[in-house]
């Protein structure tokens, strides 16, 4: 976000991809950053007409907002062969359609003790209710919190280091 201010002062054009996306949670630093970049950008590239309308209603001139769509479909399409070729299911001994994939690492879920315990208790309850493996792509923040609290996850919860793009998307697809 600070680089945008420096670029603006140096008269470097700023193009903001994902412009107008909002979660409306002012506690998240990303929300503040989005608003600053939206206002500062010379060109705001929105994923949807909804995001564009939001920016225009907030005062961003229409001539600085463009709906370009999400690049995610293109990224997935361009990587589909590598995603399908991933052998992550075999490496982890998982069966297609017979596991739950979990990623939980946001500050508000992990760093607030009550939220963390509520989340981990819910994970354990899911493991018990569905009686299937839960693959937890455990980010450093989460791992540190688990170790610090000594929280015991259900034996069906498999903690794994963060996964790469192809492996993670393969797991999501299966």
Regions found by a protein language model. Name each.
Residues 14-20, 69, 102-106, 137:
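Short beta-strands and strand-loop turn motifs
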Residues 15, 45, 66, 135, ...:
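Hydrophobic/aromatic beta-strand patches that form the interior of the parallel beta-sheet core
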Residues 24-29, 76-77, 167-171:
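Short, charged, surface-exposed secondary-structure boundary motifs
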Residues 37-115:
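A nucleotide-sugar donor-handling region in carbohydrate enzymes
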């Amino acid at each position: 976000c600070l680089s945008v201010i420096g670029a603006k002062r140096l008269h470097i054009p700023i193009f903001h991809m994902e412009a107008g996306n909002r979660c409306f949670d002012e506690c998240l630093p990303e929300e503040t950053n989005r608003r600053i970049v939206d206002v500062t950008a010379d060109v705001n590239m929105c994923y949807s007409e909804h995001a564009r309308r939001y920016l225009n209603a907030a005062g961003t001139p229409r001539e600085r907002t463009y709906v370009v769509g999400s690049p995610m479909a293109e990224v997935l399409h361009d990587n589909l062969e590598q995603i399908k070729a991933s052998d992550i299911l075999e490496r982890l001994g998982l069966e297609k359609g017979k596991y739950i994939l979990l990623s939980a690492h946001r500050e508000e879920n992990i760093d607030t003790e009550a939220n963390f315990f509520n989340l981990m208790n819910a994970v354990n309850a899911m493991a018990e209710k569905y009686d299937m493996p839960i693959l937890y792509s455990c980010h450093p923040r989460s791992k540190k919190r688990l170790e610090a609290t000594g929280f015991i996850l259900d034996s069906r919860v498999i903690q794994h280091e963060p996964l790469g793009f192809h492996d993670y998307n393969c797991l999501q697809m299966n």
